[in-house]
């Protein structure tokens, strides 16, 4: 073989071995205009006030705290400083855009030194791509390292997923997760209390290979609502072990830990601007219930939340007969706002109801702080490729010398 051809082949082998693989993403095609509640797994790139983090995602600061089971009745929550490296779940509406499920409500004001690539990878943690940003803003033919003028407002579409709000026939909220260095399918499954098999099935993965930058979705067991379609919070779903704030911050809804029944009560910050939360023809307030033992079982009368319409909180009074009277309602544990990045959001139990754990109402001290879960140590990846690349480069060096 002529030396020039050999040299070209060796150079090609070296480039293939050391070039980073293109990240894989799970995309959900869609045709419906209806958005669904979704979650994004996001790690803070810098120390940020909660208000600054919320502005990045056009989200309600209290909704972010609630989605992470962080006490949202603390004083001045928006001014709380969250540390860099803190992993959080960010609740977002997942819409249908150009036939793909994406978050379309995010706006970002560029700062000096920003590029399309830095906004996508650093600011938004790989939840979007430079191409998506350039396409959404009509910046045709722009390269990823193209500078963005400071002060420019960018539309930033983000990955998300709905998949009908179910997983294996059970209610679910989907969390979009960007794999980090050393992540494995098994480790991600363990962290979110699911199985590697389910993750592979949901993400249509033929093998359990996961590389840094890959985007997958994780189904989380959830409590769903059945509000009428004309309500502002139609389709509300809350991941197990967490909370949601709705009805203009007047109502808080929780899911778990003992079952997957949505439970809503007046929010800790509800004030005189909130509409009445009393059930009609009753003295019962939202979240109240009464028990009456009968010869046929336990008659449970409850005042439940029915959605939010034009500033009015809808309530429903229902009576149901159950074999046994339920005990006091248990709430998912709440934790204080974190001051360290060594933090894991509370993970609720599996879809199968478990014995209730001690919980607290928002605004009260938590009874316990959940233990952080950790996956296996980072697995070495692309070792063979690295060795081949080094070998090929050495051969090229010898030929050039």
From Swiss-Prot:
The keyword Lipoprotein applies. Keywords: Cell membrane, Disulfide bond, Glycoprotein, GPI-anchor, Immunity, Innate immunity, Lipoprotein, Membrane, Plant defense, Receptor, Repeat, Signal. Residues 1-23 form the signal peptide. CDD domains: LysM (cd00118). InterPro entries: LysM_dom, LysM_dom_sf. Residues 374-401 form a propeptide. Expressed in roots and leaves. Residues 106-156, 175-218 form the LysM domain. It is found in: Cell membrane. The keyword Lipoprotein applies. Pfam families: LysM. Disulfide bonds join 30-96, 36-162, 94-160, 96-162, 223-255, 250-279. Plants silencing LYP4 exhibit significant compromised defense responses and enhanced susceptibility toward the bacterial pathogen Xanthomonas oryzae and the fungal pathogen Magnaporthe oryzae. Functions in innate immunity. Functions as a pattern recognition receptor (PRR), sensing bacterial peptidoglycan (PGN) and fungal chitin at the cell surface. Involved in resistance against the bacterial pathogen Xanthomonas oryzae pv. oryzae (Xoo) and the fungal pathogen Magnaporthe oryzae. Binds PGN and fungal chitin in vitro. Involved in microbe-associated molecular patterns (MAMPs) perception and participates in the activation of defense genes against the bacterial pathogen Xanthomonas oryzae pv. oryzicola (Xoc) or the fungal pathogen Magnaporthe oryzae. This is LysM domain-containing GPI-anchored protein LYP4. It comes from Oryza sativa subsp. japonica. The lineage of its organism: Eukaryota, Viridiplantae, Streptophyta, Embryophyta, Tracheophyta.
């Amino acid at each position: 073989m002529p030396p020039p051809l050999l040299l070209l082949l060796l150079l090609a082998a070296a480039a293939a071995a050391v070039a980073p693989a293109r990240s894989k993403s799970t995309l959900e095609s869609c045709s419906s205009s209806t958005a669904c509640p979704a979650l994004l797994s996001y790690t803070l790139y810098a120390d940020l006030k909660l208000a600054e983090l919320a502005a990045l995602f056009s989200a309600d600061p209290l909704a972010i705290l609630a989605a992470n089971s962080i006490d949202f009745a603390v004083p001045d929550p928006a001014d709380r400083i969250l540390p860099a490296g803190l992993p959080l779940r960010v609740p977002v509406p997942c819409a249908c855009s150009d036939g793909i499920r994406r978050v379309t409500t995010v706006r970002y004001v560029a700062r000096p030194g920003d590029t399309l690539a830095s906004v996508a990878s650093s600011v938004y943690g790989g939840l979007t791509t430079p191409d998506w940003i350039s396409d959404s803003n009509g910046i045709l033919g722009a390269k990823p390292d193209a500078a963005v003028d400071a002060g420019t407002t960018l539309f930033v579409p983000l990955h998300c997923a709905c998949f009908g709000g179910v997983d294996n026939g059970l209610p679910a909220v989907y969390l979009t997760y960007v794999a980090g260095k050393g992540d494995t399918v098994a480790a991600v499954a363990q962290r979110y209390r699911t199985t590697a098999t389910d993750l592979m099935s949901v993400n249509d993965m033929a093998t359990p290979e996961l590389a840094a930058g890959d985007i997958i979705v994780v189904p989380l067991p959830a409590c769903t609502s059945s509000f009428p379609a004309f309500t502002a919070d139609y389709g509300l779903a809350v991941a197990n072990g967490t909370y949601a704030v709705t009805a203009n911050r007047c109502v808080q809804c929780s899911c778990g830990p003992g079952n997957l029944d949505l439970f809503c009560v007046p929010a800790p910050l509800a004030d005189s601007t909130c509409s009445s939360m009393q059930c009609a023809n009753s003295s019962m307030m939202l979240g109240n219930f009464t028990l009456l033992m009968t010869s046929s079982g336990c008659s449970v009368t409850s005042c439940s939340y029915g959605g939010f319409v034009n500033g009015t909180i809808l309530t429903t009074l229902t009576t149901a007969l159950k074999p046994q009277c339920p005990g006091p309602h248990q709430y998912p544990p709440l934790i204080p706002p974190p001051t360290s990045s060594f933090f894991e959001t509370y993970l609720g139990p599996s879809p199968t109801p478990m014995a209730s754990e001690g919980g607290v109402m928002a605004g009260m001290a938590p009874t316990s702080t959940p233990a952080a879960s950790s996956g296996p140590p980072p697995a070495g990846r692309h070792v063979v490729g690295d060795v081949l690349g080094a070998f090929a480069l050495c051969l090229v060096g010898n030929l050039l010398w």
